Amino acid sequence: MSPRIDISIDELPEASSLLDGHDYSSQIIQRIAGVPVILDASGCPHSPFFEVEYDDRTIRFTSRHDNEHIVELGRKLDYVHHNCSGFLKTFFLRIDVIDGHCYSLSNHAKSLSIAFRTGGRVGPFLHLLSSHYFCVNDFSVTQIGRQEVKLSSAACTQTMTIKRIENRWIDVLCFLLGRTMASCNTNMPLLIERYCKSARLHHGLSGIEAVIVFSNKHSPYFADEEGRRNVLSLVDTEAIRRLLSPKLKDPSFDYGVNKSDEQREITAKLSISYDKYYPNKKIVKLIALQLASSGRYHPKLMSSDYFSPQSDWADIHLLLIPNTFNDPIFIYYQLALLTGLGNRMRLQKYLSVLSRYFSGMISRQEFNERAVELFGEAACFLPIGRLSSAFFMRNTFPEEGLRERILNVLLER
C-alpha cells in the first residue's frame, strides 16, 4: 500500500508563506507543507512521484511508490532541484555506539533511520552522535577514529541506517513518510512552531557553533595578526546571538552597531564568504554592518560553497561546526589546518600538543586549555556562539528506551 500524508491546514504556516516558488528550467517547484511539487501553467500541482490533492482543510500527498523507493525519490527530486548537480560525494560523519549496539550505513529490515544533511565535505556537520569519526564516500565508510568499531556484524541487534538527504524539504518528507526516525537540520529553527503542534513528534535543540575564520592564505589578513585582531574586535557576538534568538520579538533592539551619522573615511576593503546554509546570511549581514559602522572597513559579502574555489577569494569565512569547545580534538585540528594558526612556529606547537595528547602524556582538559591558549594568541578565529537548531524524533521506537538514550546524546545531558 502506498504511503499517504494527510496534513491539516491548522498545522501549515501562514498563508503568505505557504508557497515559496523557485524557477528551475521554466518549471516552478513549490513547497507545500515542506513537500516539493511542480506547478503547471494553470497553477495545478503535479509530481511524477506523488498524487497531490487538497481541499479546504487538508493537503494530501500519496506516494506512487512503496516505502523502499523513498530514498531514490529523494535523490531524483534533489537532482532536479540542484540542476543536475547531484549529491556531495564526500563528507565526514560523527557517530557513536550506544549500549554496545553497532550503528552503520548498512540497510537492515528493522533498522533505525536517521536523516541528515551537510553543506560541505567537512562542515557544517550534523551533530547527532559523537565519539567516533568516519569518512563517507558514496555510502562506503572508512573509520578515522581511535577505537575499533565493526561497521557490519551479524551480532548487531540494532542498526542505524544513515540517509544522506541534501534537500531540507526531502528531509522533512522522508520523516513524515516514516522512512526516517529522526531529523536534525539547522534550517528548521523557524519551523519549530509549525511541527511541534503534533503530539506524534518530538522537537528540541542541539548545539552548532558559528565561527569566523581567517583561512585564505592569499589574503593580506592571513599573515597579519594585528589586522586580524582589529577586525575581530569590532564583531559584537552578543548582538549576533540576540539577533538569532527565537524568543526575541522586539525588532528595535540594539544590534551592537554604532549608528552615528558622522561620515568616516573607508580605509580597507574586507570580503566575507558564507555557505548558503541557514542562518549564515543573517549572521554575515550583521557582521558587515558592524564592520562598516566603524568607518574602517568596507565589507563585501560572497555566497559560495566553502570548499569551492570562490571561497578562496574571501578574507574571512563564516563556518558552522558542532560543539567547538566540548569536542576540541577534531574541531581544533580542522581549525589549525584551515588557519595555519598565523605562523608555522605556532602551528608546530599545536601539533606537538596534539601528539602528546594522543600518546597519553596529557589529559583532554590539558589539551583543551593549551589549544585555547594557542588559538587565542593567533587571533585567527572567533567563536560567535551556539546556534539553535531543531530536530524531530518520533515518540515510538522499535526498542524500548532507545529514544531516551539518543535524546540524552542529542541534548548533551
In which residue ranges do the predicted regions lie?
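A bilobed periplasmic-binding-protein/Venus flytrap-type ligand-binding module shared by bacterial periplasmic
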Residues: 40, 64-65, 115-119, 164, ...
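Short, well-ordered beta-strand elements
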Residues: 2-11, 58-61, 112-114, 147-151, ...
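Detector for C-terminal structural segments
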Residues: 4-12, 23-30, 35, 98-110, ...
